[in-house]
C-alpha cells in the first residue's frame, strides 16, 4: 500500500494558485478565535483513500503564475519555527533531494527535472535572501524528521488522518540556516507560499483543511516552545545532524508577535497534533536521523567525562605511590611508631648494649638521640663513661647525630642560598660523619675494648657503619630533617648554655619525644650533676642566651612563635619531670630550652606527637599540633615532605638535590 501511494504522488503535481491579494482577508486577531477548537474525533470526514486522489494531476508547465511580489508577502513571527512547504511534487522525494522554490518572481520547474543537491553546499542561493526565508526542505523541515510537521497543499490534505505526521516538541528542533540567512528584518518576517504552504509551531499542530478545521489560539501553542528552544540551544544542536547552528533570534521577537495574528492560506489551518498518528514518511525520515543523532551525543558527552575523571585517577594513584614510597623508604621509621611512649627509648637504650651491630637499632630519631646521649658526645668532662658498653652501631648513630647538628648549623645558609651544591654538601657531611666516628672511637677506646672482648661480629669498623648510615639518610628526607633539627638544637644549646652536657640536652629532647618517667629519671640522674655544676655560675647567662637562642632558632628552623609562648607557659610540668632542679632561673632556662625543643620536634613529627605531648600533661602542645602541624606538616611550619619552611628546611631541600 505504501509503494502505491508513493508512485501516485510522484507523478502528480498539484496546482492550487491563489493570488496573494485574495489571501489578505485571512488575518484574524487571536482574541476572535474562540470557537475554532474542534476535537480530533469530530474530524471524521477527512479520511479519503489515496487511490481517490487520481484526478489532481496538473502538468508542471502550468505552474507559471506562482510569482508573488515581495511587497504582498505576509509575515509571520517567529522565523525560527517556520517551515517552508513545497508543492506536492517536492514532498514525495527524500529531504536531501529537494530544491528550493524561489518566491521572488521565479517559475517552479518540474520536480522530475530537478538536479539532486548533495551535499547542501551545491544549492543555488536565493536572492534576495535577506528579504525571503526560502530554505532547503532538509533545513526547514528540521532535523530530526520526527520533530517536523509536513503541511501539504489543499489537495493533499485528503489523505487519511492516521497517516498525518506526528510532531515532537520544537525544543529539540534545530533550524539550520537561521544564523546565515535570517538577518534583520527577516528575523520578524516569513515568506508565505501561495496556497501550498503554511508555517505552524511544530510541537502542537498539524494541518487540516480549513473548511473543516479551525485554529487553536496561537497564544497557547507558540509561546511555550519558543522559550524552551532559546534556553537550551546547545542541547538541540548536539542532537542534530549539523552541530554548529544556533538560533539567534531575540527572545522577545520569538514570543511576543506570536500572540497577535496568524495568517493562514485557504488550504490549511492548524489543529492539535497530539492525537494524530505517524505516517510512513515519518518512519522513512526518522531512521537515518536517529543513527546520526546518537553517535555525536555519545562522543560529545561521554568522552569529556572520561577525560575529566582521568586526572582524578592519576591524582589518587600519585597519592598512593607517594605513601608507599615513604613507608618503604623510612624502613619502619615513621615517627608515630617511635614517639608513642618512652618505652621506645628505654628499649633502644637497652638494646644498644648488645653486640649485634646496627641491627640492634631502628632507623628513627630516638636511636640517634639515645646513642648521642649514651656517649655524651662533646662532653669532655665525662669521657669514657660508657666505653665498656659501646658497640659499633652506637658510635655510628651518635656520630651521624653529632655531624648533622654541626653540619647544618654551619652550612645551612650556604646550601639555602645556593653557594654550596648538593654534591659538595653531601661530601662534606660524610667527612664530618667520618671525623665524628673516629673521635668517638678514640674517646671510648673502642679498638682496645673490642679486641679484648673479641666482638668481631660488629664489623670492627664504626666509621664505615657511620658513613653507610649517613648515606641512607639521603633517601629519607623526613628522618634527615628531624635529625638536622634536633642536632642543630643540641649544638646550639651546648654552645649557648654554658657547656650544657650532651646527656642533658639529648635527655631533654628525648622527653619531648615521648620518654617515660623511668627514662627521664635515668637521664636526669646523668644530667643533674652537670646541670647543678654549670647552673651554679651560669644561671643568669643561660637565661639570656637561651632567650636569644629561641628567637634565632625559630627563624632558622621555621618554628612559630605561638608554640614557644605555649611551651613556656607550661614549663612547670617539665621542670619537675626532667630537671630535678629547684633553681628558679634554671627552671626558666630549662623551660625555654624545652619549649624550643618541643616546637621544633613538633614541626618535624606532625600528628604522631599529639598523644605523646598530652601524656606529658601539656594540653597546649597537643592543641598546637592539631592546629599547626597536622596533615604531614603541609603548612608553612616545617613540612616533613619538603624539609620545613625555615632556613634549615631550605637547606635540607638543597642538600638532597641530585
UniProtKB/Swiss-Prot annotation:
The highest taxon in the source lineage is Eukaryota
Compositional bias ranges of the Low complexity kind? 516-639
Q: Where in the cell is it found?
A: Cytoplasm
Keywords in UniProt for this one? Cytoplasm
Q: What is this protein called?
A: Uncharacterized protein C1235.01
Annotated stretches, region: Disordered: 516-646
- GO cellular component terms, A-Z: cytosol
